[in-house]
Design a protein with these regions (language model features):
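N-terminally biased helix-coil "hinge/interface" segments that flank
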Residues: 2-597
Length: 597
């Protein structure tokens, strides 16, 4: 192979770990590999990562020296929170004078519900900051150690202005052999309770994430790649693995961010809705003016000082099963063939479809018994799915990832047609209409929330089931649509192309030029520490006058780029087509009115 420089993206999923190699100059996808995710290996998922890297490099003759960027997306932080697999946290609250009692109350955050029945357990000690001696701090830390805490959080009112006391607690805790962090390291916003809560969630993730980060980093080094490993963030950017060790909370929900990054960087979507459809669910997000839309994250219904992409997930996808009640289709999903442990009818050999008969089952013990499967002479039963309906109706191209055995699907749906007295096509359209009405409602919400123009946006589909969802949805809603190139790997591609990103917020009423200069300086320090080349960094400043928030958003690449690979030249014919589509007309009705340059 030639010596072109490449970027590697790795996406660690529940079942498979995907790896892609992308040409650094052209964005061409050079290679793709899929290996089983190694949850139970001695090195955990890191073992699957090294297998994916070695396979993709060896098979394609790529030298590790030619890899100039490597990053991976992880669901570990999200999974740890959902499963309650987190460390017990000790909080050292501080305050003085009239603020002392309020500070004591606001740093006592209690046990934080992470998911139904799963909690982050916190212990609390309070010190009057007016007498913050080393002895007082050590006494508080020792008391917390007796309560079996693994991590210390130091939290004080106004530490965003002066973090000295928090830094003292952190330093003494580290000397005691504990991992420690402070509220000022997580957020620059006032609001002691929310800052403490966010710091506690972050701290609870640190021990587990440090262990995984070390194994993953060593795995990458073992492959011979010299560039530092970057990790996907929840806002669509990446950060260095050293920063992950300090702020693992920023990787929470990052699994949803990778696909959006792919739509933004690879598909160059500037205004539209991105839908990443898998087997069980579809993740839906908005992109406006070439920017991802973000929101404040929550845990247990309480706000965190953490921004993540506004990604809305719906239990409709290629594997969604068909619900039958009263002799007709009543619903689609949320259960999928995967959850029911059934094969898709459309991915089944025709010779298995002998003597088909519809049966109604409960995919899980607590589900209703109205999900349709087709039982066959071989003793097996197969799920009727949305993918089957889309294939039968001709919405899935023959070379698509979701393309299947249409003949088998027609046999299965034919059994349902016999039971309901409808035709196969009528049933398939009923199922698609029910499903796409649900998806369409979320698309409409995003269009309204972000003031997008339906005539100018495009629906872009990614994921293995993109062609099952997006073409029918676009047709139904009258909105332009397309399937992303390499759609099944769009998340992994997004990881490989993502920029380093940092965001900083401060409470400032009527910010002065000096306030803006200071936040620009500070975020530049943070983003370069996170791995960005200073020469590539772009900083935007936002002022929220209603909330008195001064916000800086910085993005940058890990290497100096010789050209803007995101720059896209649109021909006059393409411009005419875009305008014609927006105005629901043809290109021969569009004329150039003026030109410049």
């Amino acid at each position: 192979m030639d010596n072109r420089k490449v970027r590697i993206g790795i996406d660690v999923g529940g079942t498979f770990t995907d790896a892609v190699v992308v040409d650094n100059e052209t964005y061409e996808v050079i290679a793709k590999e899929k290996v089983p995710t190694t949850h139970h290996a001695e090195r955990g998922v890191a073992q699957g990562i090294i297998e994916a890297i070695n396979t993709v490099l060896t098979k394609n003759g790529i030298s590790p020296d030619n890899v100039i960027f490597i990053a991976h997306g992880t669901t570990q932080a999200t999974n740890a929170l959902l499963e309650g697999d987190v460390a017990r946290v000790g909080i050292v609250g501080m305050g003085s004078g009239m603020e002392a009692e309020r500070s004591r109350k606001e740093t006592t955050v209690g046990n934080i519900e992470l998911a139904p029945g799963k909690y982050l357990y916190t212990e609390h000690e309070f010190i009057d900051a007016a007498s913050l001696t080393d002895e007082a701090v050590k006494e508080a830390i020792d008391a917390l150690k007796l309560k079996n805490v693994e991590v210390i959080v130091a939290s004080e009112s106004y530490s965003v202005d002066n973090p000295e006391n928090e830094q003292k607690v952190i330093g003494l805790a580290v000397k005691e052999g504990l991992v420690a962090t402070g509220g000022h390291e997580i957020s620059q916003l006032y609001g002691l309770q929310a800052r403490t809560r966010t710091a506690a969630v972050n701290a609870a993730l640190i021990p587990k994430m440090m262990e995984t980060a070390n194994m993953t980093e060593n795995a990458v080094k073992d492959s011979g790649i010299k560039k530092p490993l970057m990790i996907m963030r929840c806002d669509g950017g990446v950060m260095s693995i050293d920063e992950v060790r300090k702020r693992p909370i920023l990787t929470m929900l990052s699994g949803l961010a990778a696909g959006v990054a792919g739509a933004l960087m690879y598909e160059k979507l500037t205004d539209g809705i991105f839908l990443e459809a898998g087997g069980t669910s579809t993740d839906i997000s908005a992109i406006k003016d070439g920017k991802v839309m973000i929101k404040n994250a929550q845990i247990g219904g309480r706000k965190l000082y953490l921004t993540s992409l506004d990604v809305r997930t719906l239990g409709i996808a290629g594997g969604s099963m068909i619900v039958v009640r009263g002799g007709k289709i009543a619903d689609v999903g949320p259960r999928s063939a995967h959850i029911a442990e059934k094969e898709y009818e459309v991915f089944t050999d025709t010779d298995k479809m002998k003597n088909p008969k519809i049966e109604l089952i409960a995919p899980r013990e607590d589900d209703t018994s109205d999900y349709a499967v087709v039982a066959c002479a071989n003793g097996e039963s197969y799920a009727l799915t949305l993918a089957g309906a889309a294939n039968i109706l001709g919405y899935v191209p023959a070379d698509d990832y979701a393309a299947g055995n249409v003949e088998s699907a027609k046999i299965a749906w034919g059994a349902l047609a016999s039971m309901t007295g409808s035709t196969v096509e009528e049933l398939c359209r009923q199922a698609m209409d029910i499903a796409m009405t649900k998806v369409g409602e979320i698309v409409k919400q995003l269009i309204a929330d972000y003031n997008l123009n339906p005539n100018l946006i495009c629906l872009v589909g990614g994921g293995g089931s993109a062609s099952v969802v997006v073409p029918y949805l676009g047709e139904k809603m009258g909105i332009r649509h397309k399937i992303a190139e390499n759609a099944p790997y769009i998340s992994t591609i997004g990881v490989s192309l993502a920029l380093v990103r940092e965001q900083m917020e401060r409470n400032v009423a009527n910010p002065t030029d000096e306030d803006i200069r200071k936040i620009r300086h500070d975020i530049m320090e943070v983003i370069t520490r996170a791995g960005a080349d200073a020469a590539t960094v772009d900083i935007s400043i936002e002022i929220d006058s209603q909330k008195n928030i001064l916000r800086a958003i910085a993005t940058g690449a890990t290497e100096l780029r010789t050209k803007d690979r995101n720059a896209k030249t649109i021909s006059e014919e393409e411009q005419k087509q875009i305008l014609a589509d927006a105005e629901k007309t043809t290109t021969d009705m569009v004329e150039r009115a003026a030109a410049a340059g």
